[in-house]
Design a protein with these regions (language model features):
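Primarily a LysM-type cell-wall glycan-binding module
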Residues: 49-83
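Extracellular LysM carbohydrate-binding repeats and other cell-envelope/extracellular binding modules
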Residues: 30-56, 81-119
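C-terminal domain-boundary segment and adjacent tail
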Residues: 145-175, 277, 299, 303-338, ...
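Acidic/histidine-rich, surface-exposed loop or edge segments in extracytoplasmic proteins
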Residues: 56-58, 70-71, 127-137
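Metal-dependent polysaccharide deacetylase catalytic core of the NodB/CE4 family, i.e.
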Residues: 122-134, 170-173, 177-182, 190-297, ...
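Short, solvent-exposed loop/turn elements at domain surfaces
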Residues: 73-74, 133-139, 192-194, 335-339
Length: 354
């Protein structure tokens, strides 16, 4: 009888194929797994605005219609708890005047810290004057008519004159400022500040800072008295320090030892501040360097004494990252025309921060 025998390896292959077919057949009969049921959708939280007679108050903003008697200041006081933020409402809505019936949006948070934006950053010009005259001008003397024209230019072109404290709060990230902010300063104790500049500043409602050096404060003549300084101090003129004698703080006299020089510096910045405090009953926090000069020793002494900041006469505007003890100031000379004045008012920079 004839027998056909498969090689052993073919026999194994045949058995493996048969087992695989049986296994696949068994898998095909299993039920497909069912997907897990999706969780039910969460209900959407509907935030209902608070509705008043003239406004809808949302978490991040207020939508309202201006009513008779409303002003930017009154709305800022009501919704932002600060009437000095009137400019913010005006700038956000891109309007200058407010009339009954106007629709307004008031954001309840101000995001642009330090004046930073996608396009660049805000800069604050600090302008400086020395003397004033009714009928003549020179490098350090501005004619009354020119000063009036410059202050009117600020008003008509949307600039906001801010106080020194507001400026430093901006540098410290404590508050925003209007886009076209400017600080006005005057150096020295000349009577023309009271006679000419002070009435013009009052006319436009502008604050200013007057830096005085105390050795020059003498009753009568061409300089200011403490009585006149006290009068101005009560009406938006912030009296601050220009040292005691107006000496250059960076230069040691040839006959001074270093100890004598250091003691003289302390008198210049500390004793003068104490005199102003005693005479006017006010805080002295800012100093203008005589001739605009400073060094590390002087700056360290100012910090130790308690000054918040100090000013040079370097031309240029000031971003939030400026050294607060080397603030730029642009001198306004008596030879300037209105275009020169305008060029000193740089309020924005599109330079890339690195």
């Amino acid at each position: 009888m004839f027998y056909f025998r498969l090689p052993f390896y073919l026999y194994c292959l045949f058995v493996f194929a048969a087992l695989l077919m049986v296994s696949c057949a068994g898998l095909s009969t299993r039920p497909e797994p069912q997907p897990f049921p999706s969780p039910p959708p969460e209900p959407q939280l509907q935030i209902q605005p608070e509705v008043t007679a003239d406004a809808r108050i949302f978490p991040d903003f207020v939508a309202l219609i201006a009513q008779p008697g409303d002003t930017f200041s009154s709305l800022a006081s009501k919704y932002l708890n600060d009437p000095s933020l009137d400019w913010f409402i005006a700038e956000f809505n891109e309007i200058t005047f407010l009339s009954p019936g106007q629709e307004l949006i008031i954001p309840l948070q101000i995001e642009e810290k330090g004046g930073l934006s996608l396009k660049g950053y805000q800069t604050i010009p600090v302008i400086s004057y020395h003397k004033f005259s009714k009928d003549k001008s020179d490098a350090l003397t501005v004619k009354e008519s020119a000063f009036e024209e410059q202050m009117r230019f600020l008003k008509e072109n949307g600039y906001r004159v801010i106080t020194m404290d507001q400026f430093f709060d901006f540098l410290d990230f404590k508050r925003p400022l209007p886009k076209k902010s400017v600080v006005i300063t005057i150096d020295d104790d000349w009577f023309s500040t009271y006679e000419i500049a002070f009435p013009v500043l009052k006319k436009y409602g502008y604050p200013a800072t007057l830096f005085v050096y105390t050795d020059l404060i003498i009753p009568g003549g061409k300089t200011l008295s403490w009585d006149l300084l006290a009068e101005m101090s009560k009406k938006n003129m912030d009296i601050q320090c220009h040292t005691k004698s107006h000496r250059n703080l960076t230069k040691r006299n040839s006959q001074e030892s270093f100890r004598e020089y250091f003691e003289a510096l302390k008198k210049e910045v500390a004793e003068s501040a104490e005199i102003i405090r005693r005479q006017l009953n006010k805080d002295v926090k800012y100093l203008a360097y005589p001739y605009g000069d400073a060094n590390h020793l002087v700056v360290s002494l100012l910090k130790k004494v308690g000054y918040r900041g100090a000013f040079t006469v370097e031309r240029g505007s000031n971003p939030f990252f400026i050294d607060p003890y080397r603030i730029n100031r642009s001198m306004i000379f008596g030879t300037f025309n209105l275009k020169d004045f305008e060029n000193s008012l740089v309020t924005f920079s599109d330079k890339e921060l690195r």
